[in-house]
Amino acid sequence: MSLEPNGEDTLTKAAVLIEPGKPLVIEEVVVDKPGPHEVRIRTAACGLCHSDLHFIDGAYPHPLPAIPGHEAAGIVEAVGSEVRTVKPGDAVVTCLSAFCGHCEFCVSGRMSLCMGGDTRRPAGSAPRITR
């Protein structure tokens, strides 16, 4: 895949997990334009929590390569066509535990168990980030 953004994509640097138990590698990656319900954020800061460390050390198997870190703060760069709650330039923090808000798990306060179809990427979808 090309590392050239197509005008709507963004080229940025990221700490990439290539192999568990090895140091992260700083690489340039292409971040795809946001889908209809997605927001692209220019990350200003990102924490690594203990679950990230489990991915890095291999305790939680995960498809690789991967970019750890899900506790980020930054500025909205672009929004998808259906996004109505934030706009480019807004300061935001992330919650990457996607949930639908209306299934039995969400309404009972167990959003981490949500299986709402609209929170999952379809099988065979193009990658959102490429190296």
Regions found by a protein language model. Name each.
Residues 1-12:
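Basic/polar N-terminal segments that are highly enriched at the extreme N-terminus
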Residues 11-12, 50, 100:
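A structure-centric signal for secondary-structure junctions around beta-strands
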Residues 16-23:
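Extracellular beta-rich ligand/substrate-recognition surface
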Residues 23, 47-49, 98, 120:
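Active-site/binding-pocket entry motifs
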Residues 32-46, 56-107, 112:
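Glycine-rich beta-strand-centered segment in the early N-terminal region that forms part
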Residues 51-55:
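Cytochrome P450 core scaffold surrounding the K-helix E-X-X-R motif
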Residues 100-131:
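NAD(P)H dinucleotide-binding glycine-rich loop of Rossmann-like/cofactor-binding domains
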